[in-house]
Every structure is written in C-alpha cells, then in structure tokens.
A protein has these predicted regions:
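Short hydrophobic alpha-helices and adjacent helix-cap/hinge residues
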Residues: 1-164
Length: 164
C-alpha cells in the first residue's frame, strides 16, 4: 500500500510529525509519497498530484491545511481519496476519520499539572511527562458515503460519528 502525506514543510511541527509517520509507515511496509504546500493555494494541486497513486492521505496538525480544510476535503473527496488528518477539527470540515488529541482533556491535564505547581505540590523538573490514553476514532459518515466507503459496524460501534 502507498499513503500520501500532505504538509507544509515550512512548519517545523508538521515536518517533525511527518518524519515520525514515515518511520512508522516503513516499519509496517507502507510506502509514503509526499506532497508539500506553502499556502492554501497549493492544496488542490498537491492532492491532484497524489490522486491515483495513493490509497489514502494522512496529514499532521498543520496551519496551512487547517486553513484550507474545505479545499482539501473537496479535492480529496472528489478524487475518492480517504483522508486521515491529525486534528479532529478537519473531520468536521469534511475529512474522513481520525484518532486525535482531545484538546479539552489535554487542557484539563495541563491545568491539573499547573495547579500542582502553583500549590507547591510538584516542581516542573520533577513532573513526569503525561500523555492521553487512546481516544475513540472520529468518523465523518457523510464523507465515507461521498467517497463510496462503508465503515464496518465493529468500528462504528466504538467511534464518535459525524453524520453531516
């Protein structure tokens, strides 16, 4: 299988996430084709360049792609390419599915850590790094239908679903 990766190489956070993704993909025997964008004006052409070459598109949390969600989703959906973004907001914008960071939960975790510091219960240098437990998949059923994809019931029963 081949997966397309779309990102703004000028965003250090995006490039970092892509490197991690490429290593994970290689470990699973998945080929990665990259397409980079520097503005929302590049998104349509980048998706088109990957069309017919990839089984799906993955992209990290990226400001350019977030700003161009509607363009990205339309281009990929028109080409019948499943999209898996790193941010759940893009699912609401028309991308297919993700398992992403829950920013509300992350904020609560950070707030608890900050309170512990302010109350003198912990010192930042002594605190363990915290991560979220795995989240539920978030799936846009309207997008699945638009690209001709049927999501298996065993996945749907454990997912949060958007139907618009």
């Amino acid at each position: 299988k081949t997966v397309g990766v779309l990102f703004n190489a000028g965003e250090v956070n995006s490039a970092f996430q892509v490197e991690i993704f490429k290593k994970a993909a290689a470990a699973k025997g998945v080929e990665v084709l990259e397409a980079t964008v520097s503005s929302v004006n590049d998104i349509q052409q980048a998706v088109t360049s990957l069309s017919g070459k990839v089984a799906g598109l993955w992209f990290p949390t990226d400001n350019v792609l977030a700003a161009g969600t509607s363009i990205l989703a339309k281009a990929a959906n028109d080409a019948k390419i499943p999209t898996i973004p790193g941010d759940e907001a893009l699912i609401r914008g028309g991308c297919l599915a993700t398992i992403a960071v829950d920013y509300y939960t992350l904020g609560r975790m950070s707030g608890t850590m900050a309170a512990d510091i302010l109350e003198g219960k912990s010192k930042p240098a002594d605190m363990a790094i915290q991560t979220q437990d795995a989240q539920k998949p978030l799936i846009n059923l309207a997008t699945a239908k638009a690209i001709g994809l049927t999501i298996p019931e065993d996945i749907l029963k454990n997912a949060a679903v958007i139907e618009k």
